[in-house]
Amino acid sequence: MPFCLTETSLPFGKKYKGKVRDTYDLGDQLILVTTDRQSAFDRCLAAVPYKGQVLNLTSVWWFKNTQSIVPNHLIAVPDPNVAIAKKCKIFPVEFVVRGYISGSTSTSLWTQYQKGVREYCGITFPDGLRKNQKLESPVITPTTKETIHDRPISPHEIVAEGWMTQEDWDETSSYALRLFQHGMEVAQQHGLILVDTKYEFGRDAEGRIVLVDEIHTPDSSRYWLFNGYQERFDAGKEPENIDKEFLRLWFVDHCDPYKDEVLPQAPQELIVTLASRYIQLYEMITGESFVYDSNPGPVNDRILHNIQHWLG
């Protein structure tokens, strides 16, 4: 796809390449560039036009929308794909907040519940819950940020194993639940259900706890359509969503994405559909119209120009 941002090459500090974001270290600040890379199975599957812009601007919208709840690391947005952020010391715990019992992966809450697990991450769940049911109140099922696999962990273990102090856990977990409650309310006003999400927190140079990374994006969160949810749940049907799962399924059907060294190229119409779904989600989540880039040149050049202009 022409003008997709898959790689960045910028003359600013040391570069760290993640699955989706490229980070440039300026010392006390970070340049976070969200690319169009579509990741799954621990590898890059494809490039999706405008995906990076959707993720970055969705996060920016939520950062601005939630700063009265908790401060965040955002400093400036010099380009639709770029956020300038404070460098923070990140807590090694991901705050996974769930409003519904759902999921299909091996670590998902519903998969564990189906196996008979009733205590998960220190939370006791009652018998009789059904898949996709709304929980009585949102819960945090934290995971540790480890090199190979993230591990579900209870708040007691987080403190006992030295991942965080009790005081820091109490403050961050309170922020996480308040952010999620606000996110659910805003999503419902926009015709969506915020099903679950993950947050990351850090401590800035002044010692304050701040929200970092991303917030309520289509990559860090699951959204369902609000209209029709209850009727579908009562009928035992899956909720309607605007999902990216179909791209993963295409690769599973056409190769072994875990073992095959070279992956087949996803059909162009699949990529176009995925791009339109990301844009649709952005417009539903934020209630704002998506602004397409009118510059037909390489995205990396545009980003370089905009960052240089911001730096003065």
UniProtKB/Swiss-Prot annotation:
GO terms for cellular component: cytoplasm. GO terms for molecular function: ATP binding; phosphoribosylaminoimidazolesuccinocarboxamide synthase activity. CDD domains: SAICAR_synt_Sc. The keyword Nucleotidyltransferase does not apply. InterPro entries: SAICAR_synt/ADE2_N, SAICAR_synthetase_CS. Its EC number is 6.3.2.6. One of its GO terms (biological process) is 'de novo' IMP biosynthetic process. PANTHER family: PHOSPHORIBOSYLAMINOIMIDAZOLE-SUCCINOCARBOXAMIDE SYNTHASE (PTHR43700:SF1). This is Phosphoribosylaminoimidazole-succinocarboxamide synthase. The lineage of its organism: Bacteria, Pseudomonadati, Pseudomonadota, Gammaproteobacteria, Legionellales.
